[in-house]
Amino acid sequence: MSDSGGFDSHPHVALIPSAGMGHLTPFLRLAASLVQHHCRVTLITTYPTVSLAETQHVSHFLSAYPQVTEKRFHLLPFDPNSANATDPFLLRWEAIRRSAHLLAPLLSPPLSALITDVTLISAVLPVTINLHLPNYVLFTASAKMFSLTASFPAIVASKSTSSGSVEFDDDFIEIPGLPPIPLSSVPPAVMDSKSLFATSFLENGNSFVKSNGVLINSFDALEADTLVALNGRRVVAGLPPVYAVGPLLPCEFEKRDDPSTSLILKWLDDQPEGSVVYVSFGSRLALSMEQTKELGDGLLSSGCRFLWVVKGKIVDKEDEESLKNVLGHELTEKIKDQGLVVKNWVDQDKVLSHRAVGGFVSHGGWNSLVEAARHGVPLLVWPHFGDQKINAEAVERAGLGMWVRSWGWGTELRAKGDEIGLKIKDLMANDFLREQAKRIEEEARKAIGVGGSSERTFKELIDKWKCNNNTH
């Protein structure tokens, strides 16, 4: 609170995240930033969560920020068989969307604004429009991916045939004001017009122009050209302001010490500076046994020290296999003298900030890429699904890292151990990438510092929300 008054003189912002750590994490970090900027914050939650990690994360957040109000949103019964999807996270998005019309009682005045997850915006907008409540979107991927999402409905309309199908004649998708995006980089689920993902993708894409603004966890040095094009209204006519508020910083509770983190940090302390390649594919990706073996062989053949985080199942509640079962006995024995392999939660921020870490092999999840940028760690991006190829292109364009297009993605992953090893060697020995990464790290520090671009953006938003206090 400021000296000039109590809570009522400050904006009151509600946030409604969606399922998955990739969506929840930036929401909680944004909420923490809003608290630090003297906003009142309400967090709208749904239970049970899909993963145990989500439940724990929300619990730790609310304990760390007791001034945040939690409101639980009770969803209508939902039959997964009624949706054309099997992904548990996608099904939860749909369950929230189908219950969105019941949100109004949780949005009772006085609220200055609601910040909605991108996956929910088309379902939530009618509620906020009816309440005359400003609705902002937190887009949880790159600005480059947002440019595709916002322009895709118009692109589909221009490619539709008389039979209702969509045909793309070229190998690229043209986006006004920006370089074209290879068709091969577009998430395959978007191209299946009958899929649940494609339907909601189009509906959400059409809704941005009706929102009051879009917040993105990015900053100028990472995606300058894309942000300029978006705010110049060159991508989509009538698009509201796009606010680059990144890099969003980890909450204090994320820095908690536990036996696993202590073990990892102790091991890193014993390694030479810049010698370790960190390998992690996020909270949702579990490699096949075959691809896990190829990656292990690649790490060994690279000759580099490594810290490798593995997953056995997509949903952590179902992941009961031991590390030895995931890796196999032979690979487990081979790697123990060259690296450390863990199969549990890792404090990624502490890992990336450690002096021993000199490179990061990532799946291309946007939160991970922004964390690498903030710590100046060069990237080898290995996209697997969703927005990850487009995120990889953004990283490559910024000079922060590289990716190998021939490695495939989804069910077509085809990277071999020797290729992986060579690319990791290249990553760890690439002076140009290292210099670029350090430059971007410095720009990230400036963006969130006093008078920086992201700090100014937060103040601009808060000033807007203060004005809303007078009318809501």
Swiss-Prot record:
Chain residues that bind an anthocyanidin: 23, 386
Region of interest (UDP), ranges: 283-284
UniProt keyword Transmembrane, yes or no: no
Keywords (A to Z) from UniProt: Glycosyltransferase, Transferase
A Pfam family the protein falls into: UDPGT
Expression across tissues: Expressed at low levels in leaves, flowers and immature leaves.
Thermal effects: Optimum temperature is 45 degrees Celsius.
Binding residue positions for UDP-alpha-D-glucose: 140, 346, 348, 363, 366-368, 371, 387-388
Gene Ontology MF terms in the entry: 2-hydroxyflavanone C-glucosyltransferase activity; UDP-glucosyltransferase activity
Activity across pH: Optimum pH is 8.0-11.0.
Catalytic site positions: 23 (proton acceptor), 117 (charge relay)
Enzyme Commission number, as recorded: 2.4.1.360
Region forming the signal peptide: none
Reactions accelerated catalytically: a 3'-hydro-2'-hydroxy-beta-oxodihydrochalcone + UDP-alpha-D-glucose = a 3'-(beta-D-glucopyranosyl)-2'-hydroxy-beta-oxodihydrochalcone + UDP + H(+)
InterPro entries xref list: UDP-glycosyltransf_plant, UDP_glucos_trans, UDP_glycos_trans_CS
Gene3D superfamilies associated with the record: Glycogen Phosphorylase B
Family to which this protein belongs: Belongs to the UDP-glycosyltransferase family.
Function according to Swiss-Prot or TrEMBL: UDP-glucose-dependent glucosyltransferase catalyzing the C-glucosylation of 2-hydroxyflavanones (2-hydroxylnaringenin and 2-hydroxypinocembrin) and phloretin. No activity with flavanones, flavones or flavonols. Exhibits C-glucosylation activity toward 2-phenyl-2',4',6'-trihydroxyacetophenone. Can use UDP-xylose as sugar donor, but catalytic efficiency is much lower toward UDP-xylose than toward UDP-glucose.
Protein name: UDP-glycosyltransferase 708G2
Gene: UGT708G2
